[in-house]
From Swiss-Prot:
Top-rank taxon, per record: Bacteria
Species: Caulobacter vibrioides (strain NA1000 / CB15N)
Segments crossing the lipid bilayer: none
Similarity section: Belongs to the SfsA family.
Protein's UniProt name: Sugar fermentation stimulation protein homolog
HAMAP family in UniProt: SfsA
Pfam families: SfsA, SfsA_N
GO molecular function list: DNA binding
Record-linked InterPro entries: SfsA (IPR005224), SfsA_C (IPR040452), SfsA_N (IPR041465)
Amino acid sequence: MLLPQPLIHGRLVSRYKRFFADLVLDDGQEITAHCPNPGAMLGVKDAGQGAWVSWSDDPKRKLAYTLQMVEQGNALVGINTLLPNKLVAEALAADALPELSGYATIKPEVKYAEASRVDFLLTHPDRPPCWLEVKNCHFSRTPGLAEFPDCKAQRSTRHLEDLSAQVREGHRAVVLFVVQREDCETFSACAELDPAFAAGLEAAAKAGVEVLVYACEMGTQAVRIARRILWSHAHLTAI
């Protein structure tokens, strides 16, 4: 997927009120950018970190700049939580995810359960429907290990329960973690920061929900879902 061009490099000054980030661009300009990530952003919000923003000339926008990526060590980390669904939609349309290939229709944002919407519903006349939930993952504090979540994620835990209910109805249900970085080979639920989610993921898997984790190929011009990585059930690290 091509990113808004051109991405502009700078350094973070602060991220605040969830959706705002102050930066100093390489040309010395001080800006405030929209931060499309309501989470804790552990490891990718520190003053002085290199960052990449996009610029828009849309007059309806309050902020012309959007924070897209942050540099953590040698890794380029995508922080835009809106991007994974777009990446998955692109991959599904291209039949690029072998575990999710061969469906006749792909419907985004389908209402189900009492008050939930699933990210994608995949259907085929000869198969049970497949309910697909997508989760963004950027968090890594141990070399090679991606973790989710980086804060309490009650809504995500509820999504796992909803997916389990679909399995009980005879449907297929999948949770797909999209890791927006290249430097991770394994994935684990972060039990230290959200034990309820970690337990919920294990319970969902036992109930028949499929867990997929894909890492991205990151660049300042394009990002794409690139390769599947291992879900490590018992890999727990101290905070």
